[in-house]
Amino acid sequence: VQMESVFWVVSKIAWALIAPETLLLFLLILSAGLLWTRYNKQGRVLISSTVFIITLVSVLPFSSWILRPLEDRFPIPKELPNRVDGIIVLAGAENISVTAARGQPSFHDGAERLTTFVWLAHIYPDAVLLFSGGSGSLTDQKHRPADTARKIFNQSGLDPERVRFELNSKNTAENASKSYELIQPSPDQHWVLVTSAFHMPRSVGLFRKAGWNVIPYPVDFQTTKSFSLKFDLREIGRFSQGIREWLGLIVYRATGDTLTFFPGPKE
């Protein structure tokens, strides 16, 4: 357990340092500093190159090129089994700090995770419901995603008492292992996994390694079948999101937490 915590802390710090938006900010600061030294020529070249990269990523559909293979890996099920034993939703969409400050449920991207979970819960009234996810913050372990989830369940007509909460996982690998320990599902059961489409390959790979052959139900799609050219600085964040997901697939395969690099539908 201690090694899991160390891995989590190291991965959080490492990503904060190498994330594309961090590197771009570092290049801007470095180039601005060089402008005031005898290396001002190099500074002009560097700042021009950095602005060019920012413009390129903000205009061209780099984020779609990176995210779309992830989102297309698992199709939305055309139909689900008549009997669904349980439904799992992974935390990650909740804006826990704003929820705590304002008293209303607040979300980052990905609120579809919870709205789809509630919808499926109404369709399958006998299914076991599981919300999986503790605080993924290095600085705030007091407020948890479940606080936001309970509020939205209440507002959506789903009794929070019907939902089981796994509150201690800090990343997707722990979502899988701790949820499995909590539920102890049998191999013949049908469990539906709800998470963002770009996050589904990594999630399914980790759940399979834990011994849980879930039915993927991807939501929160970020891409379309076509590409458009427009200037949008938010594209940098989506590009970063895609890079993070591919790095996660590489790292989890390298550490043996998944059985294949790019988990996909089973034949």
Model-predicted segments: where are they?
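Extracytoplasmic/luminal low-complexity segments enriched in Pro/Gly and acidic/polar residues
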Residues: F221-Q222, S226, K230, E235-E267
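Lipid-exposed faces of alpha-helical membrane segments in multi-pass integral membrane proteins
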Residues: V10, L23-L30, L46-L56, I243, ...
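A structural signal for short, hydrophobic/glycine-enriched beta-strand patches
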Residues: V51, L56-I236
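Hydrophobic alpha-helical segments of integral membrane proteins
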Residues: V6-A14, F62, I66-L70, I243-I250
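Membrane-embedded alpha-helical segments of integral membrane proteins
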Residues: Q2-L35
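Transmembrane helix-loop junctions in multipass membrane proteins, especially transporters and channels
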Residues: N40, P69-I76, G256-G264
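Membrane-interface helix-boundary motifs at transmembrane edges
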Residues: L35-R44
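Structural signal for membrane-spanning alpha-helices in multi-pass inner-membrane proteins
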Residues: A32-L35, I54, S58, Y252
